[in-house]
């Protein structure tokens, strides 16, 4: 139908064109008509072909560009393309315009972020990540890349903000430090790089160290001044810590040191003397003594040292007050101990007179009696105060529990084996050897109890006299071996006479003479070893013997001359004087001549032979000899007991009062 219409129209076109050609004189045939149709169709075809080529080229360009944009944008989804070329072209144009707009937006965003990253990186001194560009455009502006750039930018912003705050904080601190140190320097430029912040921190630490050093020095100066004056010093110096202020503080301290140097020196020397005096009185060993250095040897004498000295002195004064009279008794004990050793050494190197062994014997008895009394007093004191007394760094109780070894000890190997040879009761004592050796005498401890207590004066001796450190050998006696062995056993047990009472109590003795009062005797169970040779040089500096207070004695009950010596002494062993009661004077004062005779007789009599086994005939003979001096039985009893106590009477009337040797 359509072809028929086209054929009709072509016939009409042919007829019309033929008519017109005839009018014009042109020849027009069907061939011409066909050529015209073909030429028109050919031209139209060429136009279409050109158009198609153009459209295809455009489509290709669009496709390639779209593909590149999709790649840069990271788009992987496929698009639907129409079949016709014109539709394809239009679709590509539309899609290209859309994707190009997206690309341009992301490109601008990426460029802005990258520029900011570059700027912050330069400020912070950080490295910039390389970004690939193609003809000025980003090669990759996908969402992932944009997220990375955004994260990097946020990180740099955070670092920048922190460093900015740190920089401001450091500069504020620097300003304060500079003001405190009176330093006027221009602040460094803002440099937020790591090195810049590091330099600021180093500079700040230097200023802070300088400030702390100066502040600590000022504090030391203030504390030292406070220790000197005892209160916070008031000063009008500036409150900053500049070099000038520090110099002013140093000058202030130097001037105050000069003022307090004399004060501290005087106070230190006074307190040092007081402390050393108390330390010697309290028997503190030299190793344990404090504050022994001279003032010039101490690098820094301050108020704290003075206070510590006062505290130590206060402690010693409290201890001295608590010990009371016990301290004097301890001193007498140590000094008498040194005198015993000195006398024993003197007798060992000298050929002394007949009175020398007797003097040493009296000293030894004094020592044992004083030691026994000191043990009793020390035990009571320790129980009351619940603490121990230390002498030269060691407990006094352990020192007293050591038995004193007499300076003259009989050599048992040289004792005569003549057991039956005994002197007659009326005969004089055997002769003593004096050819370079010590006489054969035994110093024994006597446990005697008296009715009356006595007051003991202080006896002083040189602190350089050493203690007994060993047993001193002596020449053998001419008496029997059996008696000598018995005497040795009695000596080692600590008493001259055996104590028949079962109690081991320690009692003070009652009688005395001008040679001093007698102290309680140490019972055999009180100690077990010899006194060590230690600490004697720790005693007070050398002092001379001085006169002492005298003590009055009471008269004892009369005893018949026929009674044995043991029976005369026995009442003394069972009586204890009332506490705090002092003895009275003698009832019957013998004549001076009789006293002298009795003294010489008692000194020459060998009292070492007296024991519980002594015969009654010997005792009676001695009493008869004493009776020959026209003395009463009461006087004889007194003389015997006084001499057994280690005392004797002098020839003058004032000798009725006991004094130390």
UniProtKB/Swiss-Prot annotation:
Residues 436-445 have a biased composition (Basic and acidic residues). Residues 410-446, 467-562, 573-592 are annotated as: Disordered. Residues 414-430 have a biased composition (Low complexity). GO terms for molecular function: microtubule binding. Residues 38-78, 100-121, 143-184, 304-320, 360-387 form a coiled coil. InterPro entries: MAP65_Ase1_PRC1 (IPR007145). Residues 472-481, 548-562, 582-592 have a biased composition (Polar residues). The keyword Coiled coil applies. This is Meiotic coiled-coil protein 1. PANTHER family: FASCETTO-RELATED, PROTEIN REGULATOR OF CYTOKINESIS 1 PRC1-RELATED. The keyword Ribosomal protein does not apply. GO terms for cellular component: cytoplasm; cytoplasmic microtubule; cytoplasmic microtubule plus-end; microtubule cytoskeleton; mitotic spindle midzone. Keywords: Coiled coil, Meiosis. GO terms for biological process: meiotic cell cycle; microtubule cytoskeleton organization; microtubule depolymerization.
């Amino acid at each position: 139908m359509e072809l028929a219409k086209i054929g009709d129209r072509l016939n009409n076109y042919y007829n019309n064109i033929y008519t017109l050609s005839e009018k014009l004189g042109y020849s027009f045939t069907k061939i011409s008509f066909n050529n015209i149709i073909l030429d028109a169709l050919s031209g139209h075809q060429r136009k279409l072909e050109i158009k198609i080529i153009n459209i295809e080229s455009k489509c290709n360009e669009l496709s390639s560009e779209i593909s590149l944009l999709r790649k840069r944008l990271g788009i992987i989804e496929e698009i639907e393309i129409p079949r016709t070329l014109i539709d394809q072209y239009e679709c590509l144009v539309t899609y290209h315009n859309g994707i190009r707009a997206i690309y341009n937006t992301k490109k601008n965003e990426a460029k802005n972020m990258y520029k900011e990253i570059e700027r912050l990186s330069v400020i912070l001194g950080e490295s910039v990540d390389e970004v690939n560009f193609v003809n000025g455009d980003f090669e990759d502006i996908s969402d992932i890349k944009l997220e990375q750039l955004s994260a990097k930018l946020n990180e740099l912003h955070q670092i920048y903000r922190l460093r900015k705050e740190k920089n401001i904080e450091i500069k504020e601190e620097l300003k304060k430090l500079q003001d405190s140190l009176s330093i006027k320097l221009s602040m460094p430029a803002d440099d937020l790089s790591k090195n810049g912040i590091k330099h600021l921190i180093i500079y700040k630490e230097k200023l802070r160290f300088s400030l702390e050093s100066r502040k600590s020095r000022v504090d030391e100066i203030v504390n030292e001044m406070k220790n000197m004056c005892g209160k916070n010093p008031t000063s009008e110096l500036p409150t900053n810590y500049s070099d000038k202020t520090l110099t002013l503080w140093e000058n202030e301290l130097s001037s105050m040191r000069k003022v307090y140097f004399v004060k501290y020196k005087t106070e230190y020397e006074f307190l040092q003397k007081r402390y050393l005096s108390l330390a010697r009185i309290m028997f503190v060993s030299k190793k344990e003594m404090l504050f022994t250095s001279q003032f010039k040897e101490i690098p820094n004498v301050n108020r704290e040292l003075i206070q510590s000295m006062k505290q130590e002195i206060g402690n010693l004064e409290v201890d001295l007050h608590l010990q009371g009279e016990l301290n004097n008794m301890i001193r007498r004990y140590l000094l008498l101990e040194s005198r015993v050793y000195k006398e024993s050494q003197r007798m060992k190197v000298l050929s002394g007179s007949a009175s020398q062994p007797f003097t040493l014997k009296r000293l030894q008895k004094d020592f044992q009696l004083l030691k026994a009394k000191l043990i009793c007093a020390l035990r009571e004191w320790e129980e009351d105060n619940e603490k121990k007394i230390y002498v030269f760094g060691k407990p006094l109780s352990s020192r007293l529990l050591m038995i004193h070894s007499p300076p003259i000890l009989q050599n048992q190997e040289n004792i005569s084996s003549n057991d039956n040879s005994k002197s007659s009761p009326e005969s004089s004592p055997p002769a003593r050897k004096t050819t370079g050796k010590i006489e054969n005498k035994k110093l024994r401890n006597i446990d005697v109890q008296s009715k009356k207590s006595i007051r003991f004066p202080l006896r002083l001796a040189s602190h350089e006299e050493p203690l007994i450190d060993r047993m001193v050998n002596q020449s053998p006696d001419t008496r029997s071996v059996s008696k000598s062995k018995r005497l040795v056993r009695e000596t080692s047990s600590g008493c001259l006479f055996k104590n028949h009472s079962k109690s081991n109590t320690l009692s003070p003795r009652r009688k005395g003479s001008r040679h001093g009062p007698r102290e309680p005797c140490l019972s055999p169970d009180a100690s077990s070893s010899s006194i060590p040779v230690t600490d004697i040089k720790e005693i007070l500096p050398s002092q001379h013997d001085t006169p002492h207070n005298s003590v009055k004695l009471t008269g004892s009950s009369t005893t018949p001359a026929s009674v044995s010596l043991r029976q005369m002494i026995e009442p003394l062993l069972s009586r204890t004087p009332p506490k705090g009661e002092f003895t009275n004077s003698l009832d019957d004062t013998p004549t001076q001549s009789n006293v002298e005779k009795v003294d010489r007789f008692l000194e020459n009599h060998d009292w070492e032979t007296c024991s519980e086994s002594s015969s009654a005939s010997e005792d009676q003979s001695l009493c008869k000899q004493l009776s020959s001096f026209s003395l009463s039985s009461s006087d004889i009893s007194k003389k015997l007991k006084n001499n057994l106590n280690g005392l004797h009477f002098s020839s003058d009337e004032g000798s009725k009062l006991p004094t130390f040797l």
